[in-house]
Amino acid sequence: MGNISPLTGTNGEIR
C-alpha cells in the first residue's frame, strides 16, 4: 500500500 503503480493507480495492490 502507498505504492505508485500504473496498473492500480496509487494502491500497488491488485484486488
UniProtKB/Swiss-Prot annotation:
It comes from the Eukaryota. Signal peptide: none annotated. Its cofactor is heme b; Ca(2+). Binds 1 heme b (iron(II)-protoporphyrin IX) group per subunit. GO terms for biological process: hydrogen peroxide catabolic process. Keywords: Calcium, Heme, Hydrogen peroxide, Iron, Metal-binding, Oxidoreductase, Peroxidase, Secreted. It is an enzyme of class 1 (oxidoreductase). One of its GO terms (cellular component) is extracellular region. It catalyses: 2 a phenolic donor + H2O2 = 2 a phenolic radical donor + 2 H2O. It is found in: Secreted. Its EC number is 1.11.1.7. One of its GO terms (molecular function) is lactoperoxidase activity. Belongs to the peroxidase family. Classical plant (class III) peroxidase subfamily. Removal of H(2)O(2), oxidation of toxic reductants, biosynthesis and degradation of lignin, suberization, auxin catabolism, response to environmental stresses such as wounding, pathogen attack and oxidative stress. These functions might be dependent on each isozyme/isoform in each plant tissue. This is Peroxidase 6. It comes from Vitis vinifera.
